[in-house]
């Protein structure tokens, strides 16, 4: 079996277990795909059924799979994922991403993750580009710039990006992945806005 065939199988398996009632993907399951009580990836995470992080990390491989396998079912799943970000995960007022949700997409966290904001800004744009839907690209491009602009709230005078914020108090830790995603995210924002 080829690597591409394995990727296709994993895509079908993920899709088989998605939330058909409210859309999106649950955080975790037992080893036999049953509901699990503790869905957290770490002690720091909220024990909620859905997260931005899971959806972001499903969007990324779906985008890359779509590059080599332009399957209609995959295109529909990609479009649904982008729409979930636009309609549920993205805060319409602040342009930051919400982090945790119940199964009906009710917000369950007040933390702002600057690294995930800037990461999502470029991943959403890239996902729309690879999908090749001109209408979706027109919607996502300005939104991706707005998310990058919101992420600027985490930028410090030395050019680094802090980890996160809650109720206006910043966690001043510097994590490598946040700095790396900032390079890519701000590069895309510049390319798309020339600012």
Predicted regions and their residues:
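Glycan-recognition and catalytic cores of secretory/periplasmic carbohydrate-active enzymes
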Residues: 1-195
